[in-house]
Amino acid sequence: MTRPAEPARAAGRHRPRKRLGQHFLTDQRIIDAIVQAIAPQPGQPMVEIGPGLAALTQPLVERLGRLTVIELDRDLALRLRRHAHLQVIQADVLRVDFTALAQTLRATPPTPPTRLRVVGNLPYNISTPILFHLLAHGSAIEDQHFMLQKQVVERMVAKPGGSDYGRLSVMLQWRYAMEKLLHVPPASFAPPPRVDSAVVRMLPHAQPAAVSRPMLEELVQLAFSQRRKLLHHTLGRWLDAHQYAGRFDTRRRAEEVPVQEYLDLAREAHRWIADGKDPPCAGA
């Protein structure tokens, strides 16, 4: 098995590209802790997003036997292809169909018929779009372990009532049970980012609430569009415009509403409109 160079030395030979948000993990203690948290087992179908200089890739593939990686950087993808046990997909991760990829990997012996495990040190400049992209593929994914900006992780796992609780919290908690695993300081990277990082574990709910994603996204976006105002001035206007007659207290701020209440509202509002109770468009 061809083994990449030790992380710190490898980072010194590659010029990080700012436009790709490249910060390479070099702290071996952190690498070991992440691998221990992931606990890869031989034969498991795993996909790593943004492998970079293979600091995490190498210990993972040693335990798995084979690993699929998604890398946008052409030079890094070329380097990774020298590794006999890596399947390299050079692509923008936002264009990757993870459901189709899971089906492909299931059909590749000796991989057993199971869901994907997805890991990665996500580029901080597009981490939220990646998380939302993966929402659509939750049924094909077993779990996710990501390195992210610490502030983003805190928003992901936030509970109602605090300033960190927002649109990201609601949308992700709808589909995942999440846990912040460890803090990663800037000095663990080359070059060091200007922010602290953290590792999060994301376990898709076996039976997420059956709601219309577009409806939920619209309601949550409206609710948090003006955080300081009561929902009566934002989401309440939408409900009034659609003549919604259900029970939902708009005398609160968006951050005070639990995830389950947003889910219930999305389900009821979608049914209300589908039943033809929505008023006709102007001029109809």
Curated annotation (Swiss-Prot):
Subcellular location as annotated: Cytoplasm
Residues given in the record as S-adenosyl-L-methionine binding sites: 23, 25, 50, 71, 92, 121
UniProt GO cellular component terms: cytosol
Key words, A-Z: Cytoplasm, Methyltransferase, RNA-binding, rRNA processing, S-adenosyl-L-methionine, Transferase
One term of GO molecular function: 16S rRNA (adenine(1518)-N(6)/adenine(1519)-N(6))-dimethyltransferase activity
Function of the molecule: Specifically dimethylates two adjacent adenosines (A1518 and A1519) in the loop of a conserved hairpin near the 3'-end of 16S rRNA in the 30S particle. May play a critical role in biogenesis of 30S subunits.
Protein name from the UniProt record: Ribosomal RNA small subunit methyltransferase A
Pfam families: RrnaAD
E.C. number: 2.1.1.182
Stored PROSITE patterns: RRNA_A_DIMETH, SAM_RNA_A_N6_MT
Keyword ATP-binding tagged: no
SUPFAM superfamilies: S-adenosyl-L-methionine-dependent methyltransferases
Catalyzed reactions per annotation: adenosine(1518)/adenosine(1519) in 16S rRNA + 4 S-adenosyl-L-methionine = N(6)-dimethyladenosine(1518)/N(6)-dimethyladenosine(1519) in 16S rRNA + 4 S-adenosyl-L-homocysteine + 4 H(+)
Family per record: Belongs to the class I-like SAM-binding methyltransferase superfamily. rRNA adenine N(6)-methyltransferase family. RsmA subfamily.
